[in-house]
């Protein structure tokens, strides 16, 4: 037996349908597309969300909300992510250098999630009450 002698077991694989290849195939002539009309043509599909001229759902519902521009330049950092920063002083720039936050971020807030394992000095970064208590309990301090 060689690789070129291998073949699947009889009846284990079905032939794929080839529309438009004779009436005996069951998909001859119109090829399962029906007679005339937009969807019988090649490329004849309607846009997603089109409802036949009826006012579409996304235009019937009211607009609401907005995207806050403040969210663009602010970020939240977990306590566990502070371990990625080398050095004892953690600032916004040191977080950027350690790839913890994106380069365009200007303000950061530390959240209580995870653990801080070493004493660090936080410089110019806000923190929640719980995060501040956890950092100070580990021997760290805050500088404005």
From Swiss-Prot:
NCBIfam families: rplO_bact (TIGR01071)
Name by which UniProt lists this protein: Large ribosomal subunit protein uL15
One Gene Ontology CC term in the entry: cytosolic large ribosomal subunit
Coiled coil: none
Lineage start: Bacteria, Pseudomonadati, Pseudomonadota, Gammaproteobacteria, Pseudomonadales
Keywords of this entry: Ribonucleoprotein, Ribosomal protein, RNA-binding, rRNA-binding
Biased composition (Gly residues): 21-31
UniProt record similarity statement: Belongs to the universal ribosomal protein uL15 family.
Self-association state and partner proteins as the record states: Part of the 50S ribosomal subunit.
GO biological process: translation
Role, per record: Binds to the 23S rRNA.
Xref: Pfam families: Ribosomal_L27A
SUPFAM superfamilies assigned to the protein according to its UniProt record, in alphabetical order: Ribosomal proteins L15p and L18e
Chain intervals for the UniProt region annotation (Disordered): 1-57
Recorded GO MF terms: rRNA binding; structural constituent of ribosome
Native source species: Pseudomonas putida (strain ATCC 47054 / DSM 6125 / CFBP 8728 / NCIMB 11950 / KT2440)
